[in-house]
Amino acid sequence: MRHPVRTLLLTCVCILVACKPRDPWITPTPIPPGYDFPGSREEIQQWADAWNTARITPKAWNLWAGLHADSGQVYPGTGLPMPIWDTWNGEELFPAPDQPTPDVSRRKATHGFHGPRQFHHPAGSGPVVTPTDQLVSFNKFNPEMAAYLTQGHPAAPGGPSFFYNRFTSLADLNSQWPANTPTAQRTVQQAPYTAPSAGNRGSAAMELKPVLYLVKKQKPTPVPVWRGLAGSVNSDTTCTPEQQEADKCHPTPSLWLTCAIVDPTAPADAPIEEATPEQIQGVAPLIDQVNSAHPGSAILSCEHYLHTPLSALYSFQMTADEAKAFNSTNIEGLQAEAGDYAVLTAMHVNTKELANWTWQTFWWQPGSDAPDDFPGSKKGMTDKVTGAGRNYAMCTAYNQTQGRGSSKMTVCFNPYLETSPNIPLGVQSNCMTCHGTAAVASAFANTASSPPATWVLQTPSYPCDYKAPINFATYPWFTGFTTTDFSWAIPADPQPLPQNPNNLPSPATLNCP
């Protein structure tokens, strides 16, 4: 005999379980074979010492291709293929003080947007300027780097372990050094690298900083496009050699005169071409909406327009939670909604294939390259780069100078990031010199302008200039600090504390003169 009540109860339970939203999980996936990663450290160092860009450039492009290889996983809700890089763990590896370290073997399929942290560096060269650019960012770490960040590391054999993903542990690490410890020894353990050998692919830690803009799901949306220093507002007066030397040249994306009308309604095979008057008129209301949100300081300065399909750059659709996170980053102007697109406009990429890491940075460059290929270009791109990836430019910094023994400094910056006025001499910078100054003190600073307090570890300034290479083993500004193996993520990504845990004084070497 059947029991109607029991049957009804079981049916209701089954329906509730079936209808309950499930957290989709993504498995972090390494770059597959075939993309020259990782390479031989000895060989790559020889290229860097000889400034052998004929070998460095294709290696960097193959790395770009490998990052965007199909992971075999999809974006939940859309079923669209997910590239390798987006399977990797992000800043969830830095848990709140009372929370356990997350499982690095999987991640939730969401993105934690925030403004680029270098725009708010706690030890800058001057007053922090509020950005007016419509971009967000986050960090990504390949499986080797994720394991490194979440495991304990002793400062000396047999000693206590310190965790590089928590501020209190980093402060304790810095405090335990004897007073006479040389600068070169006041450091975290090096991120992992294993050389390839017969029968072993090898491995190397990797960090990424993707930078994304918003494109509305059903509306063509303008996105600034870099056209060199001369392609920004008033560049003839603000970016002269004298103004550059005085750190007055900061052509941020909000000042760029060229914009691409990214059209989600255009066919995927539509060409990148000059926009028509009708297409330009179509985005005028959006531009007015964006600029009216910040009177007196334009967010978009478009005067020349391209028209591109959405397929011309990498993108994914945002969930409602991601749209909310996007809108919470204090971005003025357009507001994101579920289904809108986050489009990849830039990405910093660094790998532990060198002791000082390899450095390459990519930015969206539809159409022609910037004048004088500054600071980089699409030249030398390999056939492994396909699809939207071929619309990005790149520069590399495998050495601080253009070869060992050279006095000519490398210039390699990302136009979407290092043009910020909060970054000293960004248009003269290079990735290796900048990241080489990453370090933590034991003292904390409150970075909140109003309650509640957000206490973070103090760090040294970014380099004050790029006139000469830094000797990181003897750099005097590291007095009182522990260097973090060229990773600004280690000093920047741990969760802030609600109160100062130690009330220690700040180091003497904190800001640029």
Which positions does each model-derived feature cover?
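Bacterial N-terminal signal peptides that target proteins for export
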Residues: 1-9
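Hydrophobic h-region of N-terminal signal peptides that target proteins for export
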Residues: 12-19
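Conserved small-residue
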Residues: 20-433, 438-513
